[in-house]
Amino acid sequence: MKQCLSVMRWQFGTWLGSARTVTAFLVFEPFIYNSSTRHIATLMFLGLMLLFADAPFTEQSAMYSLVRCSRVQWVVGKLMYILLSCAVYYIFSLAVTVLFFSPNAFAGNVWSAPFYELVMRDAAASSYHITVDPKLFMPVVTPYLAAFYALALNLGYGFFCGSLLFLINLSGSRVLGFAVLSAQHIISYLIRFKYLPFFISVFSNHGFSEDAGLPSVGFSCAYFCLFAAIIVACILRAVRHVDLKITVGTRI
């Protein structure tokens, strides 16, 4: 047992000189990594859908507000709630990652050496199956700007999903809304990895060597804004023809 404990102490002693132990990350890099990793992004998506599970929020206590405002004002208020909820959700996620890693991280606007190696080298991907994509963003984007882009794109995608769920649930069943949202999320990954024809989406990720052909962040944000405007217009049109009830048998 004495020899076993000696081996264990020696192994712990190697931590002091290991670059994996003492090399710090930038505080925003975990959030950037989470936003670009498929399984973590999907878990965040599921959490957001759970937040909007009761869309279009027509419970009895909330429906009394229709007595004091028009249907258009009611819809605008609900959409403002969805947008602000998305902002709180993703800002909270950013804050949690920053606080969790802050004891062993720095705040400078420069990429850390470990994260740079994970992104730019193939050794981590081949040995540990850890990948961060796309590779081309790191040389041209600062960490602070990358964190802002990740937050903005998450917010755009979250509002798109929340407003689409609101529209579908307003006109149909909640099961249909979740089915449509889940299908579009899965299809987006199939398109990204070439399981569907490229012409279906301009966002097809067709390999690291061709990442330069992907749309810019500005174009992606404009795309989200366009689809959000279309969905909002459809909601404003649909709400005029939907039966909204405060109590059973009472139509507003």
Segments (PLM) and residue ranges:
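Secretory targeting signals
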Residues: 24-55, 79-166, 170, 203-225
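Transmembrane helix boundary and interhelical loop/hinge segments in multi-pass membrane proteins
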Residues: 51-67
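Residue-level recognition of transmembrane alpha-helices
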Residues: 78, 181-182
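Hydrophobic alpha-helical transmembrane segments of polytopic
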Residues: 86, 180-181
